[in-house]
Amino acid sequence: MIQTSIKQVVENIKVIAQTLFPEIAFVDFAKYHDKGLEKEGVRLVYSLSDSMSFNMHTDLFSLNFEMLDLLETLQDPDERILEVTSDTRDISSSFVDYLKKNGYYFQDSVSVTKVDKKYKDGLGGVAFTLDFNLAKTCLV
């Protein structure tokens, strides 16, 4: 299912995450990741990356994703970091698999990086970037 606009991809990703992944409590297309902190559970925040390219039949653009959860709890800090990293990696893997199986995403592997406690609210998890193809509209 090749898309024709960036806006279409962004909106579809939000719908997919909200309807098919109940473990994701908050989804937002935003630059700042500390929105929706009143929600408990895993959050998916994504934004447009700086890279795009024009090709012969399709164009390419990238979205940066962060799958995050709170690290600051009453649990042992090391155990919580391990739990959050494991959970967010598992959810991200399923999410990327769904996008690939349904034609949104086309590459065979995705590099995933660990997000340490980098936000003031103690959010951590995993981050990854996906490239998407856009069909060119045919102008005659």
Regions found by a protein language model. Give the residues of each.
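Catalytic micro-motifs at enzyme active sites that drive phosphoryl/nucleotidyl and oxygen chemistry
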Residues: 51-54, 111-121
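Oligomerization/assembly interface segments of phage tail-like spikes and tubes
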Residues: 57-72, 124-136
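Short, hydrophobic/π-rich interface segment
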Residues: 82-106
